[in-house]
């Protein structure tokens, strides 16, 4: 029986390019070689697609160590230089039509989690891991996510959405509006980025301008939210029609909030599995995670993040991540490992769920 060819798609044009490579490397290492032939498919920062030897070489890099020992910019420049001097031709899209049986999407952030790659694969009739176009696009936009889950009865942080064009047209009016509607601190964040890129915690009016301008560099839609008290609790969800929900996990940031450097460079955050909350709150968080998953029309997988205040018993949804990290420090695979599902079996299930869903039949 011939092996099924899995296109492992990684890299991409987002700010999470390097993390995508680390995730893909972990995934490639555990895909069953007796069932699947892995075709690494690397997308450069500039959007050029490569397979073959060059993509294989990218997967062999120790990106985690490069990020720790140099910087994000330096690591990105190294990858760009490799792409410029590979001497290899870009990917032939005609191969999509006949040479790929399914795709494992390991792209994070823009162009990977926002429905664009999903739409391309639907067009070619190729099954793929994770959510479909609509669920991906909505979950990527934190403002739209808030609207959807609020409709389903799930609490979110008080917040407002600001367009960058509105801010630059009248900065003082925007600042005044925020000051009138919120008490400090607040979070200012791009609506559609992951890994805490572009997010600032603002403690007083003097920090607001810099935070808004930072967020505007990354997105045309900005979300301002009240900073919530409590523990950062995460839940992993897996499946299509009958999703499984993992036990809870907790992130204790090494700095004031769990930012990109904390996650991937300094490795300063602490993880607790299960989360250090009461059994009753743990069960409610798991129920809310499943409700959010269904409300957004998710399939395959998602990691759903909350703030939990044990004193008041308040549970507030923070965000839904439809392609969570698969690095060795990522919470999603750790949560399922702690729930009794090893990493290799998790990847196997994701591939199986992809094959269960005909292309174009998911939301």
Swiss-Prot record:
Q: Which GO terms describe its biological process?
A: cell wall organization; peptidoglycan biosynthetic process; regulation of cell shape
Top-rank taxon, per record: Bacteria
**Sites where the protein binds ATP:** 179-234
Give the record's GO CC terms: cytosol
**EC number(s) per UniProt?**
6.3.2.4
**Cofactor(s) listed:** Mg(2+); Mn(2+)
Q: Which GO terms describe its molecular function?
A: ATP binding; D-alanine-D-alanine ligase activity; metal ion binding
Pathway terms, separated by semicolons? Cell wall biogenesis; peptidoglycan biosynthesis
Q: Where does Mg(2+) 2 bind?
A: 319, 321
Q: Where in the cell is it found?
A: Cytoplasm
Q: Which InterPro entries match?
A: ATP-grasp (IPR011761), ATP_grasp_subdomain_1 (IPR013815), D-Ala_lig_Van_CS (IPR000291), D_ala_D_ala (IPR005905), Dala_Dala_lig_C (IPR011095), Dala_Dala_lig_N (IPR011127), PreATP-grasp_dom_sf (IPR016185)
- Cofactor note (record): Binds 2 magnesium or manganese ions per subunit.
Q: Which keywords accompany this UniProt record?
A: ATP-binding, Cell shape, Cell wall biogenesis/degradation, Cytoplasm, Ligase, Magnesium, Manganese, Metal-binding, Nucleotide-binding, Peptidoglycan synthesis
Tell me which residues bind Mg(2+) 1.
305, 319
Record has Cytoplasm as a keyword: yes
Q: Which reaction does it catalyse?
A: 2 D-alanine + ATP = D-alanyl-D-alanine + ADP + phosphate + H(+)
**All residue ranges annotated as the ATP-grasp domain in the record:** 146-352
Matching entries from Pfam families are given as: Dala_Dala_lig_C, Dala_Dala_lig_N
Q: Which family does it belong to?
A: Belongs to the D-alanine--D-alanine ligase family.
Its biological purpose is as follows: Cell wall formation.
What's the protein called, per UniProt? D-alanine--D-alanine ligase
Record organism: Chlorobium phaeobacteroides (strain DSM 266 / SMG 266 / 2430)
């Amino acid at each position: 029986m011939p092996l099924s060819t899995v296109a492992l798609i990684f890299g991409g044009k987002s700010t999470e390019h390097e993390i995508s490579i680390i995730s893909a490397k972990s995934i490639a290492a555990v895909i069953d070689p007796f069932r699947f032939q892995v075709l690494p498919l690397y997308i450069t920062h500039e959007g050029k697609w490569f397979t073959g030897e060059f993509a294989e070489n990218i997967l062999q890099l120790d990106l985690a160590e490069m990020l720790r020992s140099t910087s994000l910019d330096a690591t990105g420049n190294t990858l760009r230089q490799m792409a410029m001097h590979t001497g290899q031709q870009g990917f032939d899209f005609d191969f999509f039509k006949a040479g790929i049986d399914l795709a494992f999407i390991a792209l994070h952030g823009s162009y990977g989690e926002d429905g664009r790659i999903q739409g391309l694969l639907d067009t070619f009739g190729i099954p793929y891991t994770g959510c479909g176009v609509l669920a991906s696009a909505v979950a990527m936009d934190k403002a739209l996510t808030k609207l959807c889950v609020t409709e389903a009865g799930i609490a979110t942080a008080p917040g407002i959405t600001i367009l960058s064009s509105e801010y630059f047209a009248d900065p003082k009016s925007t600042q005044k509006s925020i000051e009138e509607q919120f008490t400090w601190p607040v979070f200012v964040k791009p609506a559609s980025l992951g890994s805490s890129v572009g997010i600032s915690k603002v403690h007083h009016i003097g920090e607001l301008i810099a935070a808004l301008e930072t967020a505007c560099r990354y997105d045309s839609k900005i979300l301002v939210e009240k900073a919530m008290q409590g523990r950062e609790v995460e839940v992993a969800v897996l499946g299509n029609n009958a999703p499984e929900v993992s036990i809870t996990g907790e992130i204790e940031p090494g700095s004031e909030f769990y930012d990109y450097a904390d996650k991937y460079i300094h490795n300063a955050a602490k993880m607790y599995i299960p989360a250090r909350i009461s059994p009753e709150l743990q069960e409610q968080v798991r129920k809310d995670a499943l409700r959010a998953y269904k409300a957004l029309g998710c399939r395959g997988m998602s990691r759903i993040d909350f703030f939990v205040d044990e004193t008041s018993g308040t549970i507030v949804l923070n965000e839904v991540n439809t392609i969570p990290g698969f690095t060795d420090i990522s919470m999603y695979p750790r949560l399922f490992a702690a729930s009794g599902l090893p990493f290799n079996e998790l990847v196997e299930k994701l591939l199986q769920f992809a094959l269960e869903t005909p292309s174009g039949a998911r939301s």
